[in-house]
Amino acid sequence: MVVAKKSLGQHFLMDESFLDRIVNALPPLNSLRLIEIGVGLGDLTLKLLDRYPLKTYEIDSNLCEKMRARLRAEKKPFQLELVEKDALFLKEEEPYFLISNLPYYIATRLVLNALKDPKCRGLLVMTQKEVALKFCAKDSQNALSVLAHTIGNATLLFDVPPSAFSPPPKVFSSVFEVIKEPLKEKALASLAQAPFFEEALQKGFETLEDFLKACFSSPRKTLSNNLKKSVSYKEKLDKVLDFLALENQPTSVRASEVKDYLKLLKSVLKG
Protein backbone atom coordinates (compact mmCIF):
# COMPACT_ATOMS: atom_id res chain seq x y z
CA MET A 1 0.00 0.00 0.00
CA VAL A 2 1.31 3.44 -0.96
CA VAL A 3 0.89 6.21 1.63
CA ALA A 4 0.65 9.75 0.26
CA LYS A 5 3.54 11.96 1.36
CA LYS A 6 2.49 15.33 2.74
CA SER A 7 5.98 16.68 2.06
CA LEU A 8 5.41 16.15 -1.68
CA GLY A 9 1.83 17.42 -1.64
CA GLN A 10 0.48 14.07 -2.84
CA HIS A 11 -3.27 13.65 -3.37
CA PHE A 12 -4.00 10.77 -5.73
CA LEU A 13 -6.90 11.19 -8.17
CA MET A 14 -8.95 7.98 -7.92
CA ASP A 15 -12.30 8.80 -9.54
CA GLU A 16 -12.50 7.07 -12.94
CA SER A 17 -14.92 9.61 -14.39
CA PHE A 18 -12.57 12.52 -13.73
CA LEU A 19 -9.57 10.56 -14.99
CA ASP A 20 -11.46 9.96 -18.24
CA ARG A 21 -12.48 13.61 -18.49
CA ILE A 22 -8.86 14.71 -18.22
CA VAL A 23 -7.70 12.31 -20.94
CA ASN A 24 -10.61 13.27 -23.20
CA ALA A 25 -9.84 16.98 -22.71
CA LEU A 26 -6.43 16.67 -24.37
CA PRO A 27 -6.31 18.61 -27.65
CA PRO A 28 -4.91 16.99 -30.82
CA LEU A 29 -1.19 16.51 -30.20
CA ASN A 30 -0.18 16.07 -33.84
CA SER A 31 3.58 15.45 -33.64
CA LEU A 32 4.05 16.80 -30.10
CA ARG A 33 5.53 14.58 -27.42
CA LEU A 34 3.30 14.11 -24.37
CA ILE A 35 5.03 14.79 -21.05
CA GLU A 36 3.50 14.04 -17.65
CA ILE A 37 4.64 15.42 -14.29
CA GLY A 38 4.02 13.02 -11.42
CA VAL A 39 3.04 9.41 -11.98
CA GLY A 40 1.00 9.17 -8.77
CA LEU A 41 -0.51 5.70 -8.41
CA GLY A 42 -0.38 5.35 -12.18
CA ASP A 43 -4.11 5.57 -12.94
CA LEU A 44 -3.89 8.61 -15.24
CA THR A 45 -0.62 7.36 -16.71
CA LEU A 46 -2.11 4.01 -17.71
CA LYS A 47 -5.11 5.67 -19.35
CA LEU A 48 -2.79 7.93 -21.33
CA LEU A 49 -0.74 4.91 -22.47
CA ASP A 50 -3.87 3.50 -24.11
CA ARG A 51 -3.66 6.42 -26.57
CA TYR A 52 -0.18 7.96 -26.57
CA PRO A 53 3.51 7.23 -26.02
CA LEU A 54 4.41 9.05 -22.81
CA LYS A 55 7.34 10.41 -20.85
CA THR A 56 6.77 10.93 -17.12
CA TYR A 57 8.85 12.74 -14.50
CA GLU A 58 8.47 11.41 -10.94
CA ILE A 59 10.62 12.34 -7.93
CA ASP A 60 9.22 9.66 -5.57
CA SER A 61 11.20 6.42 -5.96
CA ASN A 62 8.43 4.38 -4.30
CA LEU A 63 5.89 5.55 -6.87
CA CYS A 64 8.34 4.82 -9.69
CA GLU A 65 8.72 1.26 -8.43
CA LYS A 66 4.94 0.81 -8.18
CA MET A 67 4.51 2.14 -11.72
CA ARG A 68 7.08 -0.29 -13.10
CA ALA A 69 5.27 -3.15 -11.35
CA ARG A 70 1.92 -2.10 -12.80
CA LEU A 71 3.39 -1.91 -16.29
CA ARG A 72 4.72 -5.44 -15.96
CA ALA A 73 1.22 -6.61 -15.03
CA GLU A 74 -0.76 -4.43 -17.46
CA LYS A 75 0.52 -4.37 -21.02
CA LYS A 76 -0.24 -1.17 -22.90
CA PRO A 77 -0.15 -0.33 -26.63
CA PHE A 78 2.27 2.57 -26.10
CA GLN A 79 5.60 2.86 -24.28
CA LEU A 80 6.33 4.79 -21.09
CA GLU A 81 9.65 6.52 -20.47
CA LEU A 82 9.78 6.94 -16.69
CA VAL A 83 12.30 9.52 -15.47
CA GLU A 84 13.05 9.51 -11.74
CA LYS A 85 13.81 13.20 -11.43
CA ASP A 86 12.48 16.46 -9.98
CA ALA A 87 10.20 18.04 -12.61
CA LEU A 88 11.55 21.47 -11.70
CA PHE A 89 14.55 20.44 -13.80
CA LEU A 90 12.44 19.23 -16.72
CA LYS A 91 14.22 20.00 -19.98
CA GLU A 92 13.17 18.64 -23.36
CA GLU A 93 14.93 19.01 -26.69
CA GLU A 94 11.78 18.56 -28.80
CA PRO A 95 8.38 20.31 -28.70
CA TYR A 96 5.98 18.80 -26.17
CA PHE A 97 2.59 19.11 -24.50
CA LEU A 98 2.39 18.92 -20.69
CA ILE A 99 -0.24 17.07 -18.65
CA SER A 100 -0.34 16.70 -14.88
CA ASN A 101 -2.19 16.56 -11.59
CA LEU A 102 0.22 19.03 -10.01
CA PRO A 103 1.15 19.07 -6.31
CA TYR A 104 -0.51 22.12 -4.75
CA TYR A 105 2.61 23.46 -3.06
CA ILE A 106 4.62 23.78 -6.26
CA ALA A 107 1.92 24.02 -8.95
CA THR A 108 2.33 27.72 -9.75
CA ARG A 109 6.08 27.41 -10.22
CA LEU A 110 5.73 24.37 -12.50
CA VAL A 111 3.09 26.08 -14.65
CA LEU A 112 5.27 29.19 -14.99
CA ASN A 113 8.23 27.01 -15.96
CA ALA A 114 6.12 25.45 -18.71
CA LEU A 115 4.87 28.81 -19.96
CA LYS A 116 8.45 30.08 -20.04
CA ASP A 117 9.77 27.01 -21.89
CA PRO A 118 9.63 27.56 -25.68
CA LYS A 119 9.56 23.79 -26.21
CA CYS A 120 6.28 23.49 -24.29
CA ARG A 121 3.46 24.17 -26.74
CA GLY A 122 0.65 23.91 -24.24
CA LEU A 123 -0.50 22.32 -21.02
CA LEU A 124 -3.49 20.61 -19.43
CA VAL A 125 -3.11 20.52 -15.66
CA MET A 126 -5.04 20.19 -12.43
CA THR A 127 -4.24 22.52 -9.54
CA GLN A 128 -5.92 23.98 -6.50
CA LYS A 129 -9.00 25.82 -7.81
CA GLU A 130 -7.74 29.17 -6.52
CA VAL A 131 -4.57 28.84 -8.61
CA ALA A 132 -6.48 27.77 -11.72
CA LEU A 133 -8.79 30.78 -11.41
CA LYS A 134 -5.80 33.11 -11.25
CA PHE A 135 -4.24 31.76 -14.44
CA CYS A 136 -7.55 31.77 -16.31
CA ALA A 137 -8.86 35.15 -15.16
CA LYS A 138 -9.68 37.56 -17.97
CA ASP A 139 -8.19 40.99 -18.56
CA SER A 140 -5.40 41.95 -16.12
CA GLN A 141 -6.78 40.77 -12.79
CA ASN A 142 -3.43 39.40 -11.60
CA ALA A 143 0.12 38.76 -12.80
CA LEU A 144 -0.49 35.06 -13.55
CA SER A 145 -3.44 35.78 -15.85
CA VAL A 146 -1.44 38.41 -17.73
CA LEU A 147 1.42 35.96 -18.29
CA ALA A 148 -0.88 33.13 -19.42
CA HIS A 149 -2.93 35.27 -21.81
CA THR A 150 0.10 37.12 -23.19
CA ILE A 151 1.62 33.87 -24.46
CA GLY A 152 -1.57 31.95 -25.29
CA ASN A 153 -5.15 31.26 -24.29
CA ALA A 154 -5.95 30.00 -20.79
CA THR A 155 -9.28 28.23 -20.24
CA LEU A 156 -10.83 26.77 -17.09
CA LEU A 157 -12.34 23.40 -18.03
CA PHE A 158 -13.94 21.81 -14.96
CA ASP A 159 -13.76 21.45 -11.17
CA VAL A 160 -12.85 18.30 -9.24
CA PRO A 161 -14.23 17.77 -5.70
CA PRO A 162 -12.08 16.61 -2.77
CA SER A 163 -13.97 13.30 -2.72
CA ALA A 164 -12.32 12.32 -6.02
CA PHE A 165 -8.91 12.04 -4.31
CA SER A 166 -7.14 9.87 -1.78
CA PRO A 167 -6.40 11.39 0.63
CA PRO A 168 -9.01 14.11 -0.03
CA PRO A 169 -7.58 17.65 -0.01
CA LYS A 170 -9.32 20.38 1.97
CA VAL A 171 -10.19 22.40 -1.15
CA PHE A 172 -11.60 21.92 -4.64
CA SER A 173 -9.27 21.40 -7.58
CA SER A 174 -9.73 22.60 -11.16
CA VAL A 175 -8.48 21.42 -14.53
CA PHE A 176 -7.39 24.11 -16.97
CA GLU A 177 -5.44 24.41 -20.19
CA VAL A 178 -3.12 26.94 -21.76
CA ILE A 179 -2.58 26.69 -25.51
CA LYS A 180 0.28 28.82 -26.77
CA GLU A 181 -0.22 30.99 -29.86
CA PRO A 182 2.64 31.73 -32.29
CA LEU A 183 1.56 35.33 -32.95
CA LYS A 184 1.47 36.10 -29.23
CA GLU A 185 4.85 34.43 -28.79
CA LYS A 186 6.30 36.56 -31.59
CA ALA A 187 5.07 39.73 -29.89
CA LEU A 188 6.51 38.59 -26.55
CA ALA A 189 9.87 37.72 -28.11
CA SER A 190 10.09 41.26 -29.51
CA LEU A 191 10.78 42.49 -25.97
CA ALA A 192 14.26 40.94 -26.02
CA GLN A 193 17.36 40.99 -28.18
CA ALA A 194 18.70 37.50 -28.86
CA PRO A 195 20.19 35.66 -31.86
CA PHE A 196 17.58 32.87 -31.77
CA PHE A 197 13.80 33.12 -31.48
CA GLU A 198 13.44 30.63 -28.62
CA GLU A 199 16.04 32.50 -26.58
CA ALA A 200 14.30 35.82 -27.27
CA LEU A 201 10.94 34.31 -26.30
CA GLN A 202 12.26 33.04 -22.98
CA LYS A 203 13.97 36.35 -22.21
CA GLY A 204 10.84 38.26 -23.20
CA PHE A 205 8.74 36.15 -20.85
CA GLU A 206 11.20 36.69 -17.99
CA THR A 207 11.24 40.45 -18.64
CA LEU A 208 7.44 40.61 -18.51
CA GLU A 209 7.36 38.40 -15.42
CA ASP A 210 9.82 40.69 -13.62
CA PHE A 211 7.84 43.79 -14.61
CA LEU A 212 4.56 42.27 -13.41
CA LYS A 213 6.09 41.40 -10.03
CA ALA A 214 6.79 45.10 -9.57
CA CYS A 215 3.38 46.19 -10.87
CA PHE A 216 1.40 43.78 -8.68
CA SER A 217 3.64 43.95 -5.58
CA SER A 218 0.79 45.56 -3.60
CA PRO A 219 -2.39 44.93 -5.63
CA ARG A 220 -4.54 47.39 -3.64
CA LYS A 221 -2.14 50.27 -4.21
CA THR A 222 -1.88 52.26 -7.42
CA LEU A 223 0.41 51.12 -10.20
CA SER A 224 2.57 54.22 -9.84
CA ASN A 225 3.03 53.68 -6.10
CA ASN A 226 4.13 50.10 -6.69
CA LEU A 227 6.64 51.12 -9.36
CA LYS A 228 8.06 53.86 -7.14
CA LYS A 229 9.24 51.09 -4.79
CA SER A 230 10.84 49.09 -7.60
CA VAL A 231 14.61 49.37 -7.98
CA SER A 232 14.35 48.32 -11.62
CA TYR A 233 11.45 50.53 -12.73
CA LYS A 234 11.15 53.57 -10.45
CA GLU A 235 13.30 55.66 -12.79
CA LYS A 236 10.96 54.81 -15.68
CA LEU A 237 7.79 55.93 -13.94
CA ASP A 238 7.47 58.97 -16.23
CA LYS A 239 7.21 56.63 -19.23
CA VAL A 240 4.48 54.66 -17.49
CA LEU A 241 2.52 57.84 -16.74
CA ASP A 242 2.94 59.05 -20.33
CA PHE A 243 1.65 55.70 -21.59
CA LEU A 244 -1.40 55.84 -19.33
CA ALA A 245 -2.19 59.34 -20.58
CA LEU A 246 -2.00 58.20 -24.22
CA GLU A 247 -4.31 55.27 -23.38
CA ASN A 248 -6.77 57.64 -21.67
CA GLN A 249 -6.26 55.90 -18.34
CA PRO A 250 -5.89 57.88 -15.09
CA THR A 251 -2.56 57.91 -13.30
CA SER A 252 -4.33 56.49 -10.26
CA VAL A 253 -5.04 53.10 -11.89
CA ARG A 254 -4.26 49.92 -10.05
CA ALA A 255 -2.26 47.16 -11.70
CA SER A 256 -5.42 45.14 -12.37
CA GLU A 257 -6.87 48.01 -14.43
CA VAL A 258 -4.10 48.26 -17.03
CA LYS A 259 -5.48 47.24 -20.42
CA ASP A 260 -2.36 46.05 -22.27
CA TYR A 261 0.78 45.12 -20.33
CA LEU A 262 2.80 44.08 -23.35
CA LYS A 263 2.21 47.45 -24.98
CA LEU A 264 3.02 49.22 -21.70
CA LEU A 265 6.27 47.32 -21.21
CA LYS A 266 7.38 48.02 -24.79
CA SER A 267 6.82 51.71 -24.12
CA VAL A 268 8.82 51.52 -20.87
CA LEU A 269 11.75 49.71 -22.51
CA LYS A 270 11.91 52.02 -25.52
CA GLY A 271 14.84 54.42 -25.66
UniProtKB/Swiss-Prot annotation:
Enzyme class: transferase
Keyword S-adenosyl-L-methionine: yes
Keywords from the UniProt entry: Cytoplasm, Methyltransferase, RNA-binding, rRNA processing, S-adenosyl-L-methionine, Transferase
A molecular function GO annotation: RNA binding
HAMAP family linked: 16SrRNA_methyltr_A
Family, similarity comment: Belongs to the class I-like SAM-binding methyltransferase superfamily. rRNA adenine N(6)-methyltransferase family. RsmA subfamily.
Protein name: Ribosomal RNA small subunit methyltransferase A
Species: Helicobacter pylori (strain J99 / ATCC 700824) (Campylobacter pylori J99)
Gene symbol of the encoding locus: rsmA
